[in-house]
Amino acid sequence: MCKILRYSSAVLSTTVLFALQGCGLFGGKGEDFGQLVGVSGREYDGMPTPYGMVRIPAGTFHMGQADEDPVATQVSFNKQITIGAFFMDDTEITNNEYRQFIYELQEGEGEYDFLVGKGANFIMDELYPDTAVWQRNYTHHMGDPLVTYYYSHPAFDNYPVVGVDWEAAQVFCQWRTAYLNNYRESNGMFIMPNFRLPSEAEWEYAARGGRKIAKYPWGGPYIRNSKGCMLANFKPGRGNYFDDGFAYTAPVNSYFANDFGLYDMSGNVGEWCEDAWNPAATAIVWDLNPTYNDPNEPQKVVRGGSWKDISYFLQTGTRGYEHKDSTTAYTGFRCAMTYIGRSGGNELN
């Protein structure tokens, strides 16, 4: 008899629970009976990985120069930093991807708020890649065919875009955000966080690929693999640009990715970061998701080294900078996006 009563009570409780849920007591539609139940209709299935990006798990690492760079270490000592999870493009932005950006702006100028008041020539004058960098950046270097063909010819579609300054990279991130979220909103999906340039700390953390001690993105300390092949696109020696297989830039996935699945975190082209330049930035910023923003500092951080740099600039801890308005044949960028959700590297089940 007791078992029957307990069974009947359980059935009654379950029936009442479903009835209350149907009435909206626990966030469903209908009345909430004056109870605090939250707002209904806010289902969230997790954040999808944007196309062309990889998710970088949260973690802690020691940010700073390698042991063989004692001069830089005296200015900005190594520091333990924690980085939250984020997404990052697995390759540098290519010529063809940047071309889509230019085409979309030209075809729909009125659709983007960030173009309001910029003037009719803003796209071509400020955003279109500066192809003259292939001639202007190098003394007495004239008649280079890349001036004519690098951005325009389909043979270079999968090569990293160059001749783009920090400001243009920022506008690209604004457009990419609007382009994605306009589509998602029109299809009843929640909007994604903004695309942006990675912070310098995020960039270095991602470049290390989860390794505790990594002189280069592949680990190190050597720049060749066991078969003698170069592991990145850079300048191996004076006047020697071709030992790595490419005299200039290389297609964005020509070399092995690091352990996070990121290509060309060393070499090919240097990459704009969000941060303003300060020689002692690592020492003075906070130790959790740091970004050094100084609106009065026109110099912006560039990381990774390029096809025209020696191996020192390929090291994960080596820092560099360019003026935010400068365009070069050796600087490009990739985008990042904040991950919304649990930041840990291992998700709870």
Predicted regions and their residues:
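A short glycine-rich, aromatic-capped structural motif
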Residues: 45-146, 160-168, 267
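Functional-site microenvironments in short loops/helix caps that host divalent-cation chemistry
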Residues: 24, 29-34, 55-56, 62, ...
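Bacterial Sec-dependent N-terminal signal peptides
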Residues: 1-36
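Short, P/G- and charge-enriched loop/turn segments at secondary-structure junctions
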Residues: 41-43, 73-77, 319-324
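Sec-dependent signal peptide cleavage junction
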Residues: 23-52, 119-124, 130, 340-349
